[in-house]
Amino acid sequence: MLSTLIKKMFGSRNERTLRRMEKSVMAINAFEPKMQALSNEELAGKTQEFKERFNNGESLDELLAEAFATVREVSLRTLGLRHFDVQLIGGMVLHEGNIAEMRTGEGKTLVATLPAYLNAISGRGVHIVTVNDYLAKRDSQWMRPIYEFLGLTVGVIYPDMSHKEKQEAYKADIVYGTNNEYGFDYLRDNMAFSLTDKVQRELNFAIVDEVDSILIDEARTPLIISGAAEDSSELYIKINSLIPQLKKQEEEGDEGDYTVDEKQKQAHLTDAGHLHIEELLTKAKLLDPGESLYHASNIMLMHHVNAALKAHAMFHRDIDYIVKDNQVVIVDEHTGRTMPGRRWSEGLHQAVEAKEGVPIQNENQTLASITFQNFFRMYNKLSGMTGTADTEAYEFQQIYNLEVVVIPTNRSMIRKDEADLVYLTQADKFQAIIEDVRECGVRRQPVLVGTVSIEASEFLSQLLKKENIKHQVLNAKFHEKEAQIIAEAGRPGAVTIATNMAGRGTDIVLGGSLAADLANLPADASEQEKEAVKKEWQKRHDEVIAAGGLRIIGSERHESRRIDNQLRGRAGRQGDPGSSRFYLSLEDNLMRIFASERVASMMRRLGMQPGEPIEHSLVTRAIENAQRKLEGHHFDVRKQLLDYDNVANDQRQVIYTQRSSIMAMTDTQEVVEMMREEVMDSLVDTYIPPQSLEDQWDPQALSDVLSDEFKIKAPVPDWIDKDHSIQPEQIKEKILALAIEHYDEKVRKVGRPVISQFEKSIILQTLDNHWREHLAAMDQLRQGIHLRGYAQKDPKQEYKKEAFSLFTMMLDNLKYEVIRILSSVEIQTEEDAQVVEEQRRADQIRKMNLMHESLSENDEASETQTFRRQEKKIGRNDPCPCGSGKKYKACHGSLV
């Protein structure tokens, strides 16, 4: 009540922001006549003038009006495009580090040039983030004339660039690239061997296009760089053959071996299922008779069973993935694109490969990872733009501290959004869609039919073929033809079926794409030929407008209202006419899981018959409530991911900062000396505990460890025999002196510069190995930490405590290992040090898998180099080589 009253008196926050910015628009417009009067040389010279004024103390905010006016005039002269007033407001929103919600067709690509130019004046760089490589290349080429006219350099990054090309690209004032590529480059930079190997500079200012897709839809899955772990293909194949023998429990209380939770996308074994799978595993000789699957020694077996169960119960061909060229290729649920190279982790991808009978690729070991949430929050300033952000404004504010400002359209939006029609069955729904498409065809109105899966798009395509309705299919299987299909989607009578339109990044122009038509002309085409093409396009354009503009048909509601709005937003661009309607059925996933009972009872009360639709605001509200519930659930998942990743992020920052400082050092002597002192102190404390009696000391064991591990001859028992009053601190001093003397001998042999090079290589190599193992330990901790809730403990607090303990242990082990190697390895020449460095590089420069929910179509993961053991592999049921008499899996094998 009070908030409504305040809004009436003062306007909403959005209205107040727009009013404030309108004053700045007036100031920019006041500069326009001055800019028009300047020659090209004078206009280009403005950049140098702005840089000097900035260096002399003027802020970017003070330069904004004149800089924006400069960009607008240059854009008009180079591209023939003049920024509208609403685009200037969008540019200001981005410059202030917020999100501009701008409808489809309002020129977001052009808007980005304003804040990009202004912030590039500081010389600290600007990153413009797109959802795929095609858009990064297209937008950088399209906007390049503006930047280059003004004396700025433009770079574009994409996966198959050479290291040198990428370094050059990042040096540019303004860089275009995908979210994945920026993130992976950051991780790769923190696995680099020297500062000169790094490609990125400071993360200064990012402008994220389709910000909702990148910062929300893709936030649940981290970016991961991984290498191949051990081959266990046979185990996947054996377990895969057992899963079809399990029976699904349809209803609670029914018999069955496993249950499926579609909301959480999980499959769980029932009590009967546990017994059944143990029986099957025993028959397959994977489990000893009478042994439990839950025994500590069978953790890996349980992991394989869970992965196989999930692969069979939850992941479906042509919905979650496709099989292409004998490989399982994931389909991104948000964009409908295939993701070559992206792989599910936790052994799930291998389980799906076993299910489909394609070659099984090795499991992956995480080498480095980060979430987009933590990556983008590292930028000094972050902003974004999209057509649909307002529904997620709370999440943007909570997680990224970004305000959403809804920018008014340049022309009034006249698209007609019709109420949803709900049918009892999918068959009725699809029949109604066919009728709607046919009616549009009669009046030559172009239609875009949106589906949520490849399966649905292909099913609909089959129905249209039966009715002899010509159409194009745009889904993950045919994205190579994407630009061509989109260019023709606005032609009179065109019918296009498209899986999720999020992130397509190309406008559907009524009448078809004039630019595409002109591009098809020969290079030496005359002006008359060009005019003829333009006239033909204008005729088609007018015909489509007369038919009602683009018709949008949604074949199913998405889990997120925002994705539905993105589909609708394809029509009605820049004041064009258009219409949209969603056709639903009670058999649709969203309705079936969340809203079917309520809507079904409503339909029964209204006496609905098969084939008849219901169109009612109550139904629409019930559907939107279901979507809100799901959006809330996904927000909680993302928030929880962030809470856990924040712990790992603090550790990541420490490691990466330390790594960079070590790479920057020319002399590592001080670091090694500090490590040596800590390691020797800790070693003495282990065998001669502080505040302990002499009877509790174990001087011989201490001497043995020093000799065996560090090649230091320290007769500790003799020291104690000669001086019974000797204190632990004195022993520490003696041991440290011997350790220094032992190491100084090595330094004298080869010289300090060679030793420093060797030290740096060993520290970085050991750090990388221990960090990799630590990431695996953190993953395992994360997997089981929720069980602490059953013991009335807060899992997040427990995770923080245990993660800190693991991190401390990792650092201690790291120091111990570095000093052990440095003390025990003999270095004869400078070549020896270089060999170690080359081995380290070879070890890490194996080709890595890059994994994320939305790798673009070009991001193909390379093959990984697999380690082959020389000796025979120890079987799980073989005697443990340690001599304990136990089976390997119950002894040292339980740690593997």
UniProtKB/Swiss-Prot annotation:
Its cofactor is Zn(2+). Its EC number is 7.4.2.8. It is a peripheral membrane protein. InterPro entries: Helicase_ATP-bd (IPR014001), Helicase_C-like (IPR001650), P-loop_NTPase (IPR027417), SEC_C_motif (IPR004027), SecA (IPR000185), SecA_CS (IPR020937), SecA_DEAD (IPR011115), SecA_motor_DEAD (IPR014018). The keyword Cell membrane applies. GO terms for cellular component: cell envelope Sec protein transport complex; cytosol; plasma membrane. Its main location: membrane. ATP binds at residues 87, 105-109, 507. Zn(2+) binds at residues 880, 882, 891-892. Keywords: ATP-binding, Cell inner membrane, Cell membrane, Cytoplasm, Membrane, Metal-binding, Nucleotide-binding, Protein transport, Translocase, Translocation, Transport, Zinc. Gene3D superfamilies: Helical scaffold and wing domains of SecA, P-loop containing nucleotide triphosphate hydrolases, SecA, preprotein cross-linking domain. Residues 866-876 have a biased composition (Basic and acidic residues). It comes from the Bacteria. Residues 853-879 are annotated as: Disordered. May bind 1 zinc ion per subunit. It is an enzyme of class 7 (translocase). CDD domains: DEXDc_SecA (cd17928), SF2_C_secA (cd18803). Belongs to the SecA family. Monomer and homodimer. Part of the essential Sec protein translocation apparatus which comprises SecA, SecYEG and auxiliary proteins SecDF-YajC and YidC. This is Protein translocase subunit SecA.
